[in-house]
Amino acid sequence: MKKILLLFMLFSSVTFAQIAVTHFNADWNSANDVSWFMGLEDCKTIGHTDIAKDAAAQAEHKIAVVPTIIIFKDGEEVARFQADLSFKMLATREEVQDEISNQLMSDF
């Protein structure tokens, strides 16, 4: 029984560690922050990256519009959700959460 519990705990931590999500925005666009971002489940939410203060992150991830949400699996980008021309996020929490779930299920 201990082995099963240990395996379950290990599997859970490995699964959650595989998916990371980052929210990119800028202070000048803080009115359009994605308020539901930190409530995403089954992933590690990296938090908000201000591209005005972190130009290297902007260049590395090719952020062209803010806000942008990127889902990473094992360190590689697997999905991207970007704002429209009015700098507002079009994707809903449900759409982003569905993509996280799809990425987790793709391993099975």
Residue ranges and their predicted role:
Residues 61-72:
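Structural micro-motif
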Residues 71-108:
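Non-catalytic, surface beta->alpha helical segment in thiol-disulfide oxidoreductase systems
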Residues 17-47:
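Local sequence-structure signature of Cys/Sec-based thiol-disulfide redox active-site neighborhoods
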Residues 4-13:
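Sec-dependent N-terminal signal peptides
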Residues 11, 36-37, 59-60:
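Short, flexible, glycine/charge-rich loop motifs used to bind or transfer phosphoryl groups or to couple energy/partner
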Residues 51-58:
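N-terminal post-signal-peptidase region of extra-cytosolic proteins
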Residues 14-19, 55:
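A short beta-strand-turn-helix
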